[in-house]
């Protein structure tokens, strides 16, 4: 028996993507990604991925050789704002943290996230 509800969900999502238009969606993701990259630079971080290999929907941030308390930052962000970002995984756990701007995120939602990141990071610099 196929998972009919999943097929309906997929159709709805594809319809919403097509209603926005692929080029518009790609441009929105690029704009949101540039907002995250500006935040990264503002706080003296660097992208983990080299230029040319960076995603437009997810930013992996280098942890400055382990000088930044990624686990503490993530915990404080969640406690204060109920926001969850990823602290990396496998070999890069703790030496990166990741911020997503994919899906249906908007300039407003990313700006809210940036404001929350700014609110918490002052305790970790």
Report residues per predicted region.
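A short linear hydrophobic-aromatic micro-motif
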Residues: 44-48, 83-88
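Structural signature of PLP-dependent enzymes
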Residues: 1-34
